């Protein structure tokens, strides 16, 4: 019974296998760097192709980029506020586009065609190191935003409306990056595993609904991450009316 189960296709699925690059005493996840470079290359190609010949009446890729710009500008303005959103629009937009292409790339790019000595390529956002790094970057960004706009007055936030709130707001600073990173990582990894298992069990047509659902949830996760990042920055720069 046990040997027969081990021979099933889904028994070949491996989780947590990595291609390591050793630099000094550091072990880096090589496949995450490789897939991230592919994503960055795709984004650069998209931007170059859409801005190479700008037209007054936008078409094709230029039209898509202008639509994305308008959408992200409104998102940043709504979450951060009129006074500060322009400074942070490039950051929020870059987060959204990178996560969006990472998530969709995990479902649409045939990563398995590239053979590695160990592990396999996939969405960079399905690796906890990637999502934690981005979440910590968001935390540093809203600290910087608050301090650069308010100076030391930023720390008044921790004792308002009463000093009793100090420990809770310190804990909040730790839970924000945790929730950002694990939400994105968990959703993208779960999508990839569900599609992989279905593709092994029933390779024809059956995985397609799960793939389409994964594309939808991947887009939503990119939007949630970017919106929360903008919201945290907006909270840091917000001036209370007196």
Curated annotation (Swiss-Prot):
<keyword id="KW-0813">Transport</keyword>
<keyword id="KW-1133">Transmembrane helix</keyword>
<dbReference type="Pfam" id="PF00119">
    <property type="entry name" value="ATP-synt_A"/>
</dbReference>
<keyword id="KW-0812">Transmembrane</keyword>
<dbReference type="InterPro" id="IPR045082">
    <property type="entry name" value="ATP_syn_F0_a_bact/chloroplast"/>
</dbReference>
<keyword id="KW-0472">Membrane</keyword>
<feature type="transmembrane region" description="Helical">
    <location>
        <begin position="214"/>
        <end position="234"/>
    </location>
</feature>
<keyword id="KW-0406">Ion transport</keyword>
<dbReference type="InterPro" id="IPR000568">
    <property type="entry name" value="ATP_synth_F0_asu"/>
</dbReference>
<feature type="transmembrane region" description="Helical">
    <location>
        <begin position="89"/>
        <end position="109"/>
    </location>
</feature>
<keyword id="KW-0375">Hydrogen ion transport</keyword>
<keyword id="KW-0138">CF(0)</keyword>
<dbReference type="GO" id="GO:0046933">
    <property type="term" value="F:proton-transporting ATP synthase activity, rotational mechanism"/>
</dbReference>
<keyword id="KW-0793">Thylakoid</keyword>
<dbReference type="GO" id="GO:0031676">
    <property type="term" value="C:plasma membrane-derived thylakoid membrane"/>
</dbReference>
<comment type="subunit">
    <text>F-type ATPases have 2 components, CF(1) - the catalytic core - and CF(0) - the membrane proton channel. CF(1) has five subunits: alpha(3), beta(3), gamma(1), delta(1), epsilon(1). CF(0) has four main subunits: a, b, b' and c.</text>
</comment>
<dbReference type="InterPro" id="IPR023011">
    <property type="entry name" value="ATP_synth_F0_asu_AS"/>
</dbReference>
<protein>
    <recommendedName>
        <fullName>ATP synthase subunit a</fullName>
    </recommendedName>
</protein>
<feature type="transmembrane region" description="Helical">
    <location>
        <begin position="128"/>
        <end position="148"/>
    </location>
</feature>
<dbReference type="GO" id="GO:0045259">
    <property type="term" value="C:proton-transporting ATP synthase complex"/>
</dbReference>
<feature type="transmembrane region" description="Helical">
    <location>
        <begin position="193"/>
        <end position="213"/>
    </location>
</feature>
<comment type="function">
    <text>Key component of the proton channel; it plays a direct role in the translocation of protons across the membrane.</text>
</comment>
<comment type="similarity">
    <text>Belongs to the ATPase A chain family.</text>
</comment>
<dbReference type="InterPro" id="IPR035908">
    <property type="entry name" value="F0_ATP_A_sf"/>
</dbReference>
<feature type="transmembrane region" description="Helical">
    <location>
        <begin position="28"/>
        <end position="48"/>
    </location>
</feature>
<keyword id="KW-0066">ATP synthesis</keyword>
């Amino acid at each position: 019974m046990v040997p027969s189960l081990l021979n099933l296709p889904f028994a070949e699925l491996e989780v947590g296998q990595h291609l390591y690059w050793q630099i000094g005493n550091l072990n880096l996840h090589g496949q995450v760097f490789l897939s991230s470079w592919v994503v960055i290359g795709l984004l650069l190609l998209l931007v170059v192709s859409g801005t190479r010949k700008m037209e007054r009446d936008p078409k094709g890729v230029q039209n898509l980029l202008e639509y994305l710009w308008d959408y992200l500008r409104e998102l940043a303005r709504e979450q951060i506020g009129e006074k500060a959103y322009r400074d942070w629009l490039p950051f929020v937009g870059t987060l959204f586009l990178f996560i969006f292409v990472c998530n969709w790339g995990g479902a649409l790019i045939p990563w398995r065609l590239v053979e590695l000595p160990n592990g396999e390529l996939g969405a960079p956002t399905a690796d906890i190191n990637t999502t934690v790094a981005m979440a910590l970057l968001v935390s540093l960004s809203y600290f910087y935003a608050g301090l650069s706009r308010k100076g030391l007055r930023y720390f008044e936030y921790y004792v308002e409306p009463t000093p009793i709130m100090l420990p809770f707001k310190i804990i909040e600073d730790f839970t924000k990056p945790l929730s950002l990173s694990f939400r994105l990582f968990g959703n993208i990894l779960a999508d990839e595993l569900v599609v992989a298992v279905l593709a092994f069990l029933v390779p024809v047509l059956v995985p397609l609904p799960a793939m389409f659902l994964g594309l939808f949830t991947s887009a939503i996760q990119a939007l949630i991450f970017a919106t929360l990042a903008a919201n945290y920055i907006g909270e840091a720069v917000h001036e209370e009316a007196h």
